[in-house]
Amino acid sequence: MSAQESKQARFTDVVAEAACCRLCPAMCERTAVLSELNGSVAARIMFIGEAPGRKGADRTRKPFSGDQSGKNFDRFLASIGLSRQQIFITSAALCNPRADSGSNRKPSKTELTNCSDFLRRTIEIVDPGIVVTLGSVALEALKLIESHDLSLKESAAKVQSWDGRVLVPIYHPSPQVLASHRREAEQLRDYKVVARAIKQANHLRTKPVIQIHD
């Protein structure tokens, strides 16, 4: 078995375990969004979001698709010449957390803890050179794997080191965040930081982390 086949087999095991997980009482009727639709396990850059959206990934089974957050994410990726085929996308919570009203809500600390082993194993399998967190929840979730003292407010769009990897915390691409916390022009600048981090990583490696187009 080749190294790539071994990675794929390990990922398949994690996908199967996540699909059967019922640790969170409030999400027992939800299904984990984790499959080949998340991206290639050979990807060298991983984006981590908060959780699948009710109108987006919970319905489409593909991270950041089917809703406005997904459209924004695709636009921001394209602005630095990245495509989904080049990256792996997952989230801090693999199932969609919903309020009693049926709307999206933030995953609880317990729910994030329950999902942290899936996130840890996914990171280990994919083994990305660069991790990009989308929003404060994703950044906080990394603490459950390897401690850090970063906050999104202080660390946004600043290249960091975490668990032996390059980490770039940026804001979530949701319409709410774009309207109130990080406008489109600012987010576009944040993605340029991601692009620079990729180029810098490429300079330090014989084999490029990822090819991007200016």
Question: Positions of the model-derived regions?
Answer:
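Extended, histidine- and acidic-residue-enriched regions that form the cofactor-binding/catalytic faces
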Residues: 173, 207-214
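A polyanion-binding, active-site-adjacent surface
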Residues: 2-154, 159-200, 204
